Amino acid sequence: MDVTAEAKQIMVQALGKMYSSRSQRGGLRLHRSLLLTLVMKSARDIYHSARLMSEKSGQSVTEECTSHTQEPMDTSSSTATPLRETSGQSSEDGQRSGLEGHPHPLNPAADKENCGPSRPDRHSRKRRSKTATDSDFIPCKKAKLECAEVRGVLQNSSANCGRALDSLSLVPMPRTIVTF
């Protein structure tokens, strides 16, 4: 199928689904995100199949190319592939261990999808704490008062409830004003 015809088919399907989902509660917004996922998956499958076709045409193997263009690529593991790979697994392990230290073994541009951000000047979207930005560390807790300071504060704020020679006046009592 031609790429433009497939794109038109996806667009018609998307418009039909958006029209039918507009009456649902929150359906349109949810459908847009699901539709974007569907379009990206189908575009990725088309890209990979076209890439396989260009690689296979260089090797002049046309039978395998037609099978890849008719079905989208399956990313899940199949049971037939591990049976064939068990005999050559020990030789592949030796090759893989040599490549583990290198994140881009052959072609760094081949795996753009799984790479980090290409520009180092791009800022992260995480919020930074104030302590990370300030060079001077300011403690968030208040300093505790010493016992002598607490007594002095309580004596200054105590009420004079009795006579000067009364024993009750020696006990500090904080002032409390109740309002209704």
Swiss-Prot record:
The keyword Zinc does not apply. DNA-binding protein that seems to act as a transcription factor. Mediates with FIBPB FGF-signaling in Kupffer's vesicle ciliogenesis and in the establishment of laterality in the embryo. Interacts with FIBPB. Belongs to the IER family. Pfam families: IER (PF05760). It comes from Danio rerio (Zebrafish). PANTHER family: IMMEDIATE EARLY RESPONSE GENE. This is Immediate early response gene 2 protein. It is found in: Nucleus; Cytoplasm. Residues 53-135 are annotated as: Disordered. InterPro entries: IER (IPR008653). Residues 56-92 have a biased composition (Polar residues). The gene is ier2. GO terms for cellular component: cytoplasm; nucleus. One of its GO terms (biological process) is Kupffer's vesicle development. Its main location: nucleus.
